[in-house]
């Protein structure tokens, strides 16, 4: 699997800023916030804060502490009972997955996304946290952005279910084909 985009962090940040509203709307739809949901405004504000953190903190390491922080931001004022901690084994697995210099950054980001979703590291908000954590890695490495468009959310959920039940890795290629976005660059 190769990177679809080779951008500077600044180019990647600019792309995200230009498409932020669409990205947030996709995130809200994937997180099952309908237009009439009273918590939608809170969730939207949390996504905005999380993206702001990602875009403005390039020096924050992509590690379990960053993942936990993003989850905390995304769940703020939504479900205060959700407390999550990663055990040493999961911290080590996540670290090993992120630190693979021989693999394309895009593939690492997709694998991290799927790992977080498969292991259900959070009682609630795992899709949100997984997607934004993978996107921090993508943005920091100039690989574009991962987003599941609203017209593809049901297919994503179906493929994710198959992945969790049967370890069907078709989802990895599907995410690569349909969920990686970035600018069209003129050379």
Model-identified regions with their sequence ranges:
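FIC/Doc superfamily catalytic core
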Residues: 1-187
């Amino acid at each position: 699997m190769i990177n679809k985009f080779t951008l500077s962090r600044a180019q990647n940040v600019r792309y995200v800023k230009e498409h932020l509203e669409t990205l947030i709307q996709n995130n809200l739809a994937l997180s099952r916030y309908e237009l009439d949901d009273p918590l939608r405004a809170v969730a939207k504000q949390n996504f905005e804060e999380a993206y702001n953190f990602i875009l403005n903190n390039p020096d924050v390491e992509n590690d379990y502490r960053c993942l936990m922080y993003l989850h905390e931001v995304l769940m703020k004022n939504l479900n205060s009972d959700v407390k999550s901690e990663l055990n040493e084994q999961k911290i080590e697995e996540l670290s090993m997955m992120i630190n693979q210099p021989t693999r394309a950054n895009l593939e690492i980001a997709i694998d991290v996304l799927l790992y977080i979703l498969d292991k259900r590291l959070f009682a609630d908000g795992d899709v949100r946290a997984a997607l934004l954590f993978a996107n921090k890695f993508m943005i920091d490495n100039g690989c574009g952005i991962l987003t599941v468009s609203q017209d593809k959310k049901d297919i994503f959920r179906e493929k994710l279910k198959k992945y969790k039940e049967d370890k069907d890795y078709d989802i990895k290629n599907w995410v690569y084909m349909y969920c990686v976005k970035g600018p069209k660059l003129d050379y």
